[in-house]
Amino acid sequence: MTEEQKYLFDLQGYIVLKDVVPSSAVEACNKSLDRFEDMPPEDFPSPLCLGTPKTEKEIYISNILEADAAFNFLIDIPEVLSVVQGVTCGSYRLNHTYTIYRWAGGYSGLHGHNIPISYKCQYHCRNGEMVSTLTKAVFPLMDCDVEDGCFAGIPGSHKSNFIRPWGGHPDENPVFAPIPANAGDAIIFTCLLYTS
């Protein structure tokens, strides 16, 4: 992890790594995901299951890594692991995998942060090292710009010591910011960051 990456992650609570997944891997993942878009959830191969009820605006499928070997590429990308190791102080594990399909009008309410204190998810820095005990890597499999409903969050909120004064809908939060990324990029963030 570079010094610039450390600074940006600590400042914002996230960083975007550009072009870390080759187009062939993106295509293979998308081809696999296409099978599940219209498949009834009861027909998903085990252990795939819905993470939340399916709606006309969203499908959330848990355990997607087990769906196809195409997703194995996403496990050990050196550039991603360098950042994960840097923000976790070297101790990390793959906890869970999922995919979210989202269409026009779909969104997730803001989630994350540490008030009241969540002992499973902490972020702190000491002696030039940072520890983010719950860190995620998101891999957009299509270009997601601002108008496309890209990943978004409240930069720096992972270090806030006060309760957010606005509601849970992204539109209710004036400091909420889009985090655009393209297919092949990776967004790495601490789960203390308010995201949607």
Label for each model-derived stretch:
Residues 106-180:
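Catalytic core of non-heme Fe(II) oxygenases with the double-stranded beta-helix
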Residues 1-12, 18-126:
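Non-heme Fe(II)-dependent double-stranded beta-helix
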